[in-house]
Amino acid sequence: MFYFHCPPQLEGTATFGNHSSGDFDDGFLRRKQRRNRTTFTLQQLEALEAVFAQTHYPDVFTREELAMKINLTEARVQVWFQNRRAKWRKTERGASDQEPGAKEPMAEVTPPPVRNINSPPPGDQARSKKEALEAQQSLGRTVGPAGPFFPSCLPGTLLNTATYAQALSHVASLKGGPLCSCCVPDPMGLSFLPTYGCQSNRTASVATLRMKAREHSEAVLQSANLLPSTSSSPGPVAKPAPPDGSQEKTSPTKEQSEAEKSV
């Protein structure tokens, strides 16, 4: 007798690959429950931002009221607030980290000014300039220009004043140059005015002026016949002619004789 072997029929409840149908059902449900990305409208974002500006952690009642107002679920509103708080913290952290870094490049771009070691401090320079200005002002009040010009070499009478001597010493200390006894730099800054020589040249010019003045006065007196001419030899002084123009009479005896003859 021959026997035929038939394979067993596949039943619907048989397992396939050691996986039951319940496993597929659970996975399908999990995949189906995954949420999609929500796209908010402009009006919804404005309402959410307004509430976030008031409080970062709204309570459940506020979230439900807001969800009903903008036509969303309370879960969507809660997720939006969580994401918004995370974004706000990230922005604040980035701003705090950027502040020290922004100051350092500024310090590198603008280094501190290099000051010469031999130069005085800025405070001393300002003080010296102020003292020089005060000395010049006091000099202008005490001495002042005597005419339309103010020479740089002043007479000896002005050099003897205490104020002018103090100003000269201060100017010499500022400029650092040697000063002679008579030729000094102009403390008033009148370099455009005519300058004069030293004491010897000034004395010679004064003597020349006096000599010319004396000669002029002598010439005036000679023209008025008040003094004799310097070129003529010494002799009797000539008397001036009478105002009526008549000749001078020689003696009283001749006058008497002429009068007798005329009679």
From Swiss-Prot:
Residues 33-92 bind DNA. The keyword Transmembrane helix does not apply. Transcription factor required for the formation of correct projections from nociceptive sensory neurons to the dorsal horn of the spinal cord and normal perception of pain. GO terms for biological process: axon guidance; detection of chemical stimulus; detection of temperature stimulus; dorsal spinal cord development; neuron migration; regulation of transcription by RNA polymerase II; sensory perception of mechanical stimulus; trigeminal nerve development. A motif (OAR) lies at residues 204-217. One of its GO terms (molecular function) is DNA-binding transcription factor activity, RNA polymerase II-specific. It comes from the Eukaryota. This is Dorsal root ganglia homeobox protein. PANTHER family: DORSAL ROOT GANGLIA HOMEOBOX PROTEIN (PTHR24329:SF542), HOMEOBOX PROTEIN ARISTALESS (PTHR24329). Residues 110-123 have a biased composition (Pro residues). Keywords: Developmental protein, DNA-binding, Homeobox, Nucleus, Transcription, Transcription regulation. SUPFAM superfamilies: Homeodomain-like (SSF46689). Its main location: nucleus. InterPro entries: HD, Homeobox_CS, Homeodomain-like_sf, OAR_dom, Paired_Homeobox_TFs. The gene is DRGX. Belongs to the paired homeobox family. Interacts with RGMB. Residues 220-234 have a biased composition (Polar residues). It comes from Homo sapiens (Human). Residues 88-138, 220-263 are annotated as: Disordered. One of its GO terms (cellular component) is chromatin. Residues 89-106, 251-263 have a biased composition (Basic and acidic residues). It is found in: Nucleus.
